[in-house]
């Protein structure tokens, strides 16, 4: 590949690549050595004087410099195309009839008829190739501990050419070929990948085929038209490949294997060849920066089998696991943030901004009741995690939720990392006095600021409480500066120990995640859209051979999950538990245990799960019908800080003095 790129740089520019008109034509001629300048040095003109000869040499040098500049321009100005990922559109190979055992015993080659998988009977170093020179995925060991290594191609890619038309024919690329090539690139690196897949002599069409082999399609119409001009494409299909090597071996009188000649007569213009190289670089970078789905793990049965053998499961959870309890998620179309549009906030996420809270905590406390967790309640999904823990399979539950419901379900503190904190405790932003979170729940439900008893008297000095009559008269109740000192409105306010935007994640997260990702043998992401870093990066930290499963209402397209189970989290958990023969320790399990679920495969590795005879649309309508009041926008009240000049402003932002009993209890708890 490096030699090809070097040869390409030395290749004369085509006439169209330099300029239009006579000037471009002359430049092209000079580059090929057939211009009038060189003709003047023929034997008949040997009497040309030295000065004239020097002038000719100077002109030739100038032309060479101009040519070199033009070469640099085209290399520097050519940009890579936008690439469409099409690996999922490739056909799957049929399972070979000489495999022994059932389909569930093998992995690697997928049957397009049944969706089951089979493993090539060869070892990892067996050279079994296809028309693309790619092999199948080989493994050793049991299903639970197999390590999946991509096969080295039997031989470099070899393009064939029709004898009469002299047009090229590309081998057919299967999904397994593409996945193997992508895995080979990721495991062995760019240099070995190019050395093993490409012949020593190649042209630009080999580069195009490599882009296709990695699962990408070029979008540039001009470039595609140029390729179609030199490629046999009987069906006028943009994807171009027509026959595989097994078909062409029997028609040697029609097709001939071909490698480029040393004279380097590339079928495409240089500008197209340069673009293809840059497109290949872009495709390789995309592959190297993303996870590759496992070819042997894409069915519910694969998930069930792995659950039974896994010992170090990481469960990553989000707000979707609590929606069945009436707690809204955050980022869906019906989620928490979408409902905050009525509040007039520039950015709904401002309610969880540390900077905004410091300036005016009433912004948060006017909506906090909407996300306040129910006490001593948990969903079947929470109990599903507890079940995994009880079977000694749970390495860690990394939860993005702030409701602390996992603890109610019985997940042990050492098995749980609350990545974004929780309502379990609350702390004074001024003196950092800490109490149990449930003690400020009444304040939250009444839209009141909970005030630290130790900072209460000092806060009264800074912020005098105004009566409704004084507020109606327009008197300012804010005293942001006391004796020349700036005092934030959050002075003495108790804040739930949830991680706001602008705050660092708990040290426990950073301490454990580095070790856990190396031990993990199965990752299950549940009820999360994976939009918030650094928690969203966990999927990219897991070793490539570890299966990743998504259980969520909607797909997460920016991640590469091996298996996605789309539906209500409780339903999916019930289906999986049924197939495992396990009981979920939840009061509703007897009902869920006898429920029949339908799993519809919408594409490879993606299933929609819903109760039998109930469509997903019917389930969604039924779910919305029973939404609790706390998800209704009618329960929202504008934050006090947004209507400060209004005479009808709520007085709920005024500090509520704790009772003597409260102070006594608080002092006792310390």
Curated annotation (Swiss-Prot):
<dbReference type="Pfam" id="PF02146">
    <property type="entry name" value="SIR2"/>
</dbReference>
<dbReference type="InterPro" id="IPR026590">
    <property type="entry name" value="Ssirtuin_cat_dom"/>
</dbReference>
<keyword id="KW-0678">Repressor</keyword>
<dbReference type="InterPro" id="IPR029035">
    <property type="entry name" value="DHS-like_NAD/FAD-binding_dom"/>
</dbReference>
<comment type="similarity">
    <text>Belongs to the sirtuin family. Class I subfamily.</text>
</comment>
<keyword id="KW-0520">NAD</keyword>
<keyword id="KW-0539">Nucleus</keyword>
<protein>
    <recommendedName>
        <fullName>NAD-dependent histone deacetylase SIR2</fullName>
        <ecNumber>2.3.1.286</ecNumber>
    </recommendedName>
</protein>
<dbReference type="InterPro" id="IPR003000">
    <property type="entry name" value="Sirtuin"/>
</dbReference>
<feature type="region of interest" description="Disordered">
    <location>
        <begin position="1"/>
        <end position="157"/>
    </location>
</feature>
<feature type="compositionally biased region" description="Basic and acidic residues">
    <location>
        <begin position="69"/>
        <end position="81"/>
    </location>
</feature>
<feature type="compositionally biased region" description="Acidic residues">
    <location>
        <begin position="45"/>
        <end position="68"/>
    </location>
</feature>
<feature type="binding site">
    <location>
        <position position="431"/>
    </location>
    <ligand>
        <name>Zn(2+)</name>
    </ligand>
</feature>
<keyword id="KW-0808">Transferase</keyword>
<feature type="compositionally biased region" description="Polar residues">
    <location>
        <begin position="239"/>
        <end position="261"/>
    </location>
</feature>
<feature type="region of interest" description="Disordered">
    <location>
        <begin position="617"/>
        <end position="670"/>
    </location>
</feature>
<keyword id="KW-0862">Zinc</keyword>
<keyword id="KW-0804">Transcription</keyword>
<feature type="binding site">
    <location>
        <position position="428"/>
    </location>
    <ligand>
        <name>Zn(2+)</name>
    </ligand>
</feature>
<dbReference type="InterPro" id="IPR050134">
    <property type="entry name" value="NAD-dep_sirtuin_deacylases"/>
</dbReference>
<dbReference type="GO" id="GO:0005634">
    <property type="term" value="C:nucleus"/>
</dbReference>
<keyword id="KW-0805">Transcription regulation</keyword>
<dbReference type="GO" id="GO:0070403">
    <property type="term" value="F:NAD+ binding"/>
</dbReference>
<feature type="binding site">
    <location>
        <begin position="552"/>
        <end position="554"/>
    </location>
    <ligand>
        <name>NAD(+)</name>
    </ligand>
</feature>
<feature type="compositionally biased region" description="Low complexity">
    <location>
        <begin position="120"/>
        <end position="142"/>
    </location>
</feature>
<feature type="compositionally biased region" description="Polar residues">
    <location>
        <begin position="659"/>
        <end position="670"/>
    </location>
</feature>
<feature type="binding site">
    <location>
        <position position="455"/>
    </location>
    <ligand>
        <name>Zn(2+)</name>
    </ligand>
</feature>
<feature type="active site" description="Proton acceptor">
    <location>
        <position position="420"/>
    </location>
</feature>
<feature type="compositionally biased region" description="Polar residues">
    <location>
        <begin position="96"/>
        <end position="119"/>
    </location>
</feature>
<feature type="compositionally biased region" description="Acidic residues">
    <location>
        <begin position="82"/>
        <end position="92"/>
    </location>
</feature>
<feature type="domain" description="Deacetylase sirtuin-type">
    <location>
        <begin position="293"/>
        <end position="583"/>
    </location>
</feature>
<dbReference type="GO" id="GO:0046872">
    <property type="term" value="F:metal ion binding"/>
</dbReference>
<feature type="binding site">
    <location>
        <position position="569"/>
    </location>
    <ligand>
        <name>NAD(+)</name>
    </ligand>
</feature>
<feature type="binding site">
    <location>
        <begin position="318"/>
        <end position="337"/>
    </location>
    <ligand>
        <name>NAD(+)</name>
    </ligand>
</feature>
<dbReference type="InterPro" id="IPR007654">
    <property type="entry name" value="NAD-dep_histone_deAcase_SIR2_N"/>
</dbReference>
<feature type="binding site">
    <location>
        <begin position="400"/>
        <end position="403"/>
    </location>
    <ligand>
        <name>NAD(+)</name>
    </ligand>
</feature>
<dbReference type="Pfam" id="PF04574">
    <property type="entry name" value="DUF592"/>
</dbReference>
<feature type="binding site">
    <location>
        <position position="452"/>
    </location>
    <ligand>
        <name>Zn(2+)</name>
    </ligand>
</feature>
<feature type="region of interest" description="Disordered">
    <location>
        <begin position="235"/>
        <end position="263"/>
    </location>
</feature>
<feature type="compositionally biased region" description="Low complexity">
    <location>
        <begin position="641"/>
        <end position="654"/>
    </location>
</feature>
<dbReference type="InterPro" id="IPR026591">
    <property type="entry name" value="Sirtuin_cat_small_dom_sf"/>
</dbReference>
<keyword id="KW-0479">Metal-binding</keyword>
């Amino acid at each position: 590949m490096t030699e090809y790129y070097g040869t390409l740089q030395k290749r004369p520019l085509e006439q169209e690549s330099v300029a239009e008109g006579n000037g471009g034509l002359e430049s092209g001629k000079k580059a090929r050595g057939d211009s009038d300048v060189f003709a003047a040095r023929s034997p008949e003109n040997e009497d040309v004087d030295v000065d004239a000869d020097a002038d000719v040499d100077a002109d030739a040098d100038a032309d060479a410099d101009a040519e070199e500049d033009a070469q640099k321009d085209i290399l520097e100005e050519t940009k890579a195309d936008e690439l469409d990922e099409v690996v999922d559109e490739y056909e799957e190979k049929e399972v070979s009839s000489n495999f022994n055992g059932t389909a569930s015993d093998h992995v690697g080659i997928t049957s397009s008829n049944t969706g089951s998988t089979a493993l090539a009977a060869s070892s990892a170093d067996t050279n079994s190739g296809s028309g693309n020179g790619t092999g199948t995925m080989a493994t050793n060991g049991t299903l639970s501990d197999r390590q999946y290594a991509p096969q080295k191609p039997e031989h470099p890619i070899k393009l064939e050419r029709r004898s009469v038309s002299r047009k090229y024919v590309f081998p057919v690329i299967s999904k397994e070929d593409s996945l193997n090539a992508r895995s080979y690139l990721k495991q062995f690196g760019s240099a070995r990948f190019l050395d093993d897949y490409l012949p020593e002599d190649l042209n630009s069409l080999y580069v195009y085929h490599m882009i296709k082999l990695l699962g990408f399609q070029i979008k540039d119409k001009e470039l595609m038209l140029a390729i179609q001009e030199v490629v046999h494409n009987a069906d006028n299909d943009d994807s171009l490949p027509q026959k595989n090597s097994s078909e062409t071996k029997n028609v040697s009188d029609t097709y001939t294997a071909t490698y480029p000649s040393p004279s380097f007569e590339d079928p495409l213009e240089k500008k197209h060849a340069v673009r293809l190289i840059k497109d290949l670089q872009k495709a390789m970078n995309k592959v190297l920066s993303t996870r590759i789905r496992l070819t042997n793990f894409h069915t519910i049965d694969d998930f069930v089998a792995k659950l039974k053998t896994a010992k170090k499961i990481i469960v990553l959870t989000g707000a979707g696991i609590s929606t069945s309890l009436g707690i809204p998620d955050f980022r869906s179309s019906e989620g928490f943030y979408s409902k905050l549009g009525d509040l007039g906030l520039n950015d709904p996420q401002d309610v969880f901004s540390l900077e905004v809270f410091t300036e005016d905590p009433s912004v948060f406390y006017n909506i906090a009741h909407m996300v306040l967790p129910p006490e001593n309640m948990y969903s079947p999904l929470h109990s599903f995690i507890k079940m995994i823990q009880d079977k000694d399979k749970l390495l860690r539950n990394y939860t993005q939720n702030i409701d602390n419901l996992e603890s109610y379900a019985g997940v042990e503190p050492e098995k749980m990392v609350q990545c974004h904190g929780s309502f379990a405790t609350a702390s004074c932003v001024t003196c950092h006095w800490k109490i149990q979170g449930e003690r400020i729940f009444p304040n939250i439900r009444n839209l009141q600021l909970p005030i630290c008893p130790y900072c209460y008297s000092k806060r009264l000095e800074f912020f005098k409480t105004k009566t409704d009559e004084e507020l109606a008269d327009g008197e300012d109740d804010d005293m942001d500066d006391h004796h020349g000192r700036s005092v934030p409105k959050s002075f003495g306010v108790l804040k739930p120990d949830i991680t706001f935007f602008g705050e660092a994640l708990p040290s426990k997260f950073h301490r454990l995640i580095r070790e856990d990702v190396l031990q993990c043998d199965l990752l299950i992401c549940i009820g999360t859209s994976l939009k918030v870093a650094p928690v969203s990066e966990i999927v990219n930290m897991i070793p490539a051979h570890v299966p990743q499963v998504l259980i969520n209402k909607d797909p997460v397209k920016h991640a590469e999950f091996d298996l996605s189970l789309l539906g209500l989290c409780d339903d999916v958990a019930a289906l999986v538990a049924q197939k495992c023969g396990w009981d979920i320790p939840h009061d509703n399990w007897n009902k869920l245990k006898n429920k029949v679920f339908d799993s519809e495969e919408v594409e490879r590795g993606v299933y929609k799960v819903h109760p039998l005879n109930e469509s997903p649309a019917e389930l969604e309508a039924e779910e919305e019908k029973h939404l609790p009041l706390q998800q209704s926008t009618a329960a929202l009240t504008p934050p006090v800080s947004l209507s400060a000049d209004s005479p009808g402003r709520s007085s709920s932002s005024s500090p509520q003095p704790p009772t003597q009993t409260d102070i006594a209890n608080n002092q006792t708890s310390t």
